[in-house]
A protein has these predicted regions:
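N-terminal, polar/charged subdomain of small-to-medium soluble alpha/beta proteins
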Residues: 1-102, 107-121, 125-150
Length: 150
């Protein structure tokens, strides 16, 4: 799979909706260390139906993010936008990723920053908890370790 481009270059999210007062971007990158060991690269694998799990995780995250605690959006505050969000864009790469490459990209546009921040964080958490994507991490000593298996 090709590296994810700068989110601003994607036609799906290049323009911020006129109703948005906030855009939050989460760019989950491959880092060069984990648990005190040097990391050389990662290989992500996914269940054949991972996309269905991803869509459910995003729906669950939006529902949780907009309905609970600080940043919750009341029907009155949402106005014409019943969901309280203007746009959501999510991509998770599969395959070999090098240090510094983007593994997970989440972009949330909303009328207000609290909802955008909260939903973005909830999307990342729900993806990690629900989506069958597995990470094989390769270390500088030649060893590797499978992790993140929901």
């Amino acid at each position: 799979e090709k590296p994810l481009a700068d989110p601003s270059s994607s036609p799906a999210i290049a323009d911020i909706p006129a109703t948005s007062g906030a855009r939050v971007v989460f760019n989950g990158c491959v880092r060069n260390h984990d648990g005190g060991q040097g990391v050389t690269h990662l290989i992500y694998s996914a269940h054949p139906e991972a996309e269905k799990f991803l869509l459910k995780a995003v729906r669950d995250a939006i529902e949780l993010g907009l309905s609970e605690g600080e940043g919750a959006v009341s029907p009155e505050a949402a106005g014409d936008n019943a969901a309280g969000l203007d746009a959501v864009f999510v991509r998770h790469r599969i395959g070999r990723l090098e240090i510094g490459e983007t593994a997970l990209l989440v972009v949330v546009d909303a009328p207000h920053r609290a909802a955008a921040f909260k939903v973005t964080a909830e999307i990342v958490d729900q993806i990690k908890a629900q989506v069958p994507i597995w990470k094989d991490q390769y270390f500088s000593d030649g060893s590797n370790h499978w992790s993140n298996c929901p």
